[in-house]
Amino acid sequence: MSAPESPHEFLRRDEYLGPLVEEHGELTVEPANDFFERFVVSIIRQQVSMASATATRERLFEAVEVAPEGILAADDEVLQDAGLSRQKTTYVNNIAETFVEKGYSREYFVEMSDDAIRDALTEISGVGPWTADMQLIFSLGRPDVFPVGDLGIRKGMVQLFDDLDRRDRTAMVERSQRWAPYRSYASLYLWRATEA
């Protein structure tokens, strides 16, 4: 099956997402300028409010060079003073070590499938399926990722489909197939739907 000309034209025709596309305009999925920085920001955002994540991000970016070498050169105390928990400090160090050891970059993953990338990233201690999916969408700009592990996605699905149980992830993934090959774009609209 060939991909439709535009994700927005495709989703605009969907009876459920079409109104959200009209309301919010053309939301885009693009690769991040810096894969490693975006990865670190995803770790910062795990299980905290956006305000807390933003404050920690600002302090961390002021305290150290947010690159694999910069993170590895920094004392854990410096990372924790910037607002990272001990656990997140360990995770960020694990990611930095893996990037250095394996040569990870956006280019490294270009030819790999989403599943292969997800498998590679979740081998890093501290990186689960949610974080891997966020990297696929926001770091690598992959167009067809459906992060069903995200609470906002599940809330958005229940909002759109009143017959769905918020705990039934399998049914949500099946229902999301209607938006393939643009489920990353659909996810952006699902998140927007829950912000209202």
Task: List the predicted regions and their residue ranges.
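An N-terminal domain-start capping segment
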Residues: 1, 38-42, 94, 98-101
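Intrinsically disordered, low-complexity, charged terminal extensions of DNA damage-control enzymes
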Residues: 1-31
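Alpha-helical structural motif
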Residues: 2-6, 13-16, 56, 153, ...
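Generic recognition of short, well-ordered alpha-helical interface segments
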Residues: 12, 39, 51-55, 87-94, ...
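Short helix-loop boundary/capping segments at the starts of domains
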Residues: 26, 45, 49-53, 62-66
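Catalytic cores of DNA base-excision repair glycosylases
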Residues: 27, 61-196
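Short, contiguous, helix-prone interaction/anchoring segments in small proteins
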Residues: 34-35
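A short secondary-structure junction motif
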Residues: 41-56, 81-87, 186
